[in-house]
């Protein structure tokens, strides 16, 4: 485990791009304005299919806002806050234990689909303390090998080049169709919810 602190939020997401592109598991975190500054880097990661985890401990806004808890970054997280029609899987923990569980799973989802994954908590969860279980049984995924990673080819294969630049419109269209298929697959396979006292309900409202 290696931890790095950068003076600028933009540097953090660019470090994540480089680390994720080399096949390393990487996470960057900040609160709402800091994550807003990372959006350019997140869309680069989405376009280049670089897996990483982005943790947002949400606080009130807009602007500098407040340090108090908030859930106001929903659209920025779920609809893609940077340029282009990209999407990211989003986990939204409701407790400290769920934050631990979902961050662990977020790394697996990022690797399985080669995508940045958002974890959105709020300032209340960010400041809470409770006993957590790191050893609980978790969903086991058959993760693909990272043969796409740019980690040094040692003259044994063609170098892997990872970027999000497609100068020919046909190439970009083909790439975006591929991404949209991936987002549809994530939508179909990765939805999570918890039912509570809904057995006899005629109508259920779902909100965040």
How would you name each of these model-derived features?
Residues 69-122:
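Conserved thiamine diphosphate
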Residues 10, 30-36, 42-44, 56-63, ...:
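Acidic, glycine-rich active-site loops and adjacent beta-strand->loop/helix elements
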Residues 19-37, 51-56, 92, 204-207:
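A short, small-residue-rich loop immediately preceding and capping a beta-strand
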Residues 114-195:
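Conformationally flexible catalytic loops at phosphate/diphosphate-handling active centers
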Residues 1-13:
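Single conserved hydrophobic/aromatic residue that forms the stacking wall/gate
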Residues 63, 67-70, 83-85, 181-208:
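Thiamine diphosphate
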Residues 6-7, 49-61, 141-148:
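A glycine-rich helix N-cap at a beta->alpha junction
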Residues 15-18, 38-42, 63-70, 101-104, ...:
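Short acidic, glycine/serine/threonine-rich loops at helix termini
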């Amino acid at each position: 485990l290696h931890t790095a602190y950068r003076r600028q939020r933009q540097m953090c997401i660019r470090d994540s791009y480089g680390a994720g592109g080399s096949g390393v598991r990487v996470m960057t975190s900040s609160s709402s304005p800091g994550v807003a500054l990372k959006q350019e880097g997140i869309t680069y990661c989405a376009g280049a299919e670089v897996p990483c985890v982005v943790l947002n401990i949400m606080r009130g806004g807009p602007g500098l806002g407040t340090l108090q808890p908030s859930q106001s970054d929903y659209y920025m997280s779920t609809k893609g806050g940077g340029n282009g029609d990209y999407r990211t899987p989003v986990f939204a923990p409701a407790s400290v234990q769920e934050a631990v569980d979902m961050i662990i799973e977020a790394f697996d989802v990022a690797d399985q689909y080669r995508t940045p994954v958002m974890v959105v908590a709020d300032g209340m969860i960010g400041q809470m303390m409770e006993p957590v279980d790191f050893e609980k049984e978790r969903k086991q995924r058959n993760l693909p090998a990272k043969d796409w990673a740019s980690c040094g080819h040692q003259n044994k294969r063609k170098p892997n080049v990872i970027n999000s630049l497609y100068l020919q419109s046909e190439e970009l269209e083909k790439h975006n169709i591929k991404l949209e298929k991936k987002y549809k697959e994530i939508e179909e396979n990765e939805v999570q919810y918890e039912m509570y006292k809904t057995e006899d309900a005629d109508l259920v409202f779902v909100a965040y």
